[in-house]
Each structure stands twice: as C-alpha cells, then as structure tokens.
C-alpha cells in the first residue's frame, strides 16, 4: 500500500481533513473514527483491507479538521449531515461505511436515514448510539446546560509527546503504538510544548439522546448488509445483552466477537481486517 495521502474536503459546517489509504480505483469505503480519535485510527488496518478506496476522515472538531463556530456544539444529528456532505464532496453517490465506536454509531444511523447512500456497514464496537437511561434524562439535561454556561478554560500545555501518549493510555485501554498514532495526529506544536488539536467542546455532555426503542427501530429499518466486530471484554456501554438484542433487529447481520480492547482494530489490525475483507468479498458474490 502507498503512503496515506492527505487532503481536505469543504463541507457546510467546515473543512474536513482526510486520509486516502487505498486504491482510488477500488470500491469506495468511508471510514469514521471514534470519539476523540481521528483518521489515524484506520492506518494499522489499511494495508490488510485489500484493493479498496479507503478514505478516513477527521470528523469536525477532531484531528486536523476545523472546529465548529463559537456558540454551537457537536450534536449527533449534525454529524450525520457532515457524513453525507463528505460523500457529496467526494462525488460518491454510494459507499461502504466502516466505523469504530462513535463512527460506527453514526454509520448505523446514516444507513437507517439515508439507505440509498450506503452499500454496507462494517462496524467495530458499535451498533447504534450508546444506550440512554431515560430515567436520568432531566439530570443529564441540567448538566449539559450548566456545562455550556461555564467560561472556557485555557488550553492545556503538554510538555512532550510521551506525556500525551501516557494520557491517552490512561483514558482508554489500547496499545502504546495505537495511542501514539492517535496522539501524533491530534497534537499541535506551540511554544514550550504541545496542545491538543481537538475541540474542548467535544467533552460537553449531550442535552438528549435517542431512547432505546428508537435505536431498535432504526436498526430494523437498515436494508444493507451489516458486519459487527465486537471486542471481549465488552465496554460498559456495549454489554453482550444489549448488543445481542440490537443485533437481532437487523435484517442482514453478521457478528464476530474477538478478544481485545475497545481499539481492537488498531491492536489486532490483521485479524479485524480479515473479517471485514471476507465480508466485503461475500457481498461481491451476491447476484
């Protein structure tokens, strides 16, 4: 595989940075990373995915993409339109969506809401948005409102890359190599050190989310084939019970559970890529 090629896409809400990681003449695959990650999330897997045209983006507020304007926040529904804008900017009427965590949740809802744009879903550690306990809705709403009324804090100064890598390792279980890939794309050099490029507003809690009944209705409406790769042990918000109940809502689903961390696609790229490649190959054989 050739070296990743950097480019940018202009969309309605801002400029989105992207990496082209495959063969531009191959099947079109749009890769969507997880919360506080970036396009580098898919670099380890890319050489194992075969001759696909893999484009991995930094979602707005992440990596090298622009931040949304002051006075706004990162609502889930707005990211859906960002993804459709990216497909338009690429000139792709349809594409296969590959998503990890938040990216997988977004891909799921795009497939439900704009089925004509999505050929298939390959999801890693996600099947719709995280579960939403409705009995805590008022408490979460108050926290979200209070959080937005607070004055913005000053950006944190990070003395060196090693310190940033340690911080990422403490925040989410993953290998050091995976953490370094994500960190290096999400740092900007400043006087006396580094700062995160990601928008601090990504840490704001959501005002509201979809109820579980809505998520399952979306899943049941997905027409395209779906591959789910889940890690064992499962994260708290994606336990086997709810994962399996959601999976049962799909019309055309395939699931594999493998030992690994939440970033299993970075820690075991060849193993996860083999499952995804086999899934895509099976689709090509369908008459």
Residue ranges and their predicted role:
Residues 221-260:
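Conserved loop-alpha-helix segment in the C-terminal half of the alpha/beta-hydrolase fold
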Residues 93-136:
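Conserved hydrolase catalytic core segment
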Residues 153-210:
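Conserved alpha/beta-hydrolase catalytic His-Asp/Glu region
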